[in-house]
Each structure stands twice: as C-alpha cells, then as structure tokens.
Amino acid sequence: KRLENHMKYYDLHLVLEGEEEFELCSTEELENISEKNYDEDVFFGDKEDGLIKGVLRPGYFLVTFVDEAHKLGISKPDGKHVKKIVYKIPVGGKNE
C-alpha cells in the first residue's frame, strides 16, 4: 500500500472500534510520485525510512493536512475489526 496525499481536503480519521496503525511523512519526502488526480483529490508516493508511525484507538483521532502523505489500515494490532469515520474538511473552509 502506498502513501496517499490530497490537495483540496484535510482528512480527519476518528476510530470508533478496534485499532489501526498509520504512517505519515511530508509530501516533500515522497519518491515515485504518481500523477495528481484532481477530480478524486489524490496522488500517491513512496517512502521507506523515517516515517512517523502510530496507532489509532477509540477516542483518538488523526488529522492529515495537504502537505502530509499518509497510509492507514496498515495492520490491526489487536486483530479485530476497525470501525472508523473519515471526515473530509475543505482546505480554506469551503468547497471548491
């Protein structure tokens, strides 16, 4: 699974049940960057070392900004089903 990034929306990931690992890095650190898909607001890239890593649990949240590439759903540490909500927040506070 590759790191993804968005141009028009911040992501707010809120875990309701289970646990989920994530990885983050600056988009400036990405290699092998895909073409930007503006219609779907996404592009992908790779980075092997120096990633920020963590685990989301119920009550925790993660906000990823437009300059932060992210990968979630890497593994589920407790092996259980993950239930979460992802909110898309328009950059600048309004839809473009």
Kindly label every feature range from the protein language model:
Residues 1-10, 28-33, 49-50, 56-58, ...:
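A short beta-loop-beta micro-motif enriched in histidine and acidic residues
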Residues 8-10, 14-20, 24, 29, ...:
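Glycine- and acidic-residue-biased ligand/ion/polar-headgroup-sensing regions
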Residues 21-22, 71, 94-95:
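Short, acidic Gly/Pro/Ser/Thr-rich loop/turn segments
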Residues 29, 68-69, 92-94:
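Short, solvent-exposed loop/turn segments at secondary-structure junctions
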Residues 55-73:
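Conserved metal-binding segment of the jelly-roll/cupin
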Residues 61-63, 79-96:
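A short hydrophobic beta-strand segment most commonly corresponding to one strand
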Residues 74-78:
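Short proline/glycine-enriched turn/loop segments at secondary-structure junctions
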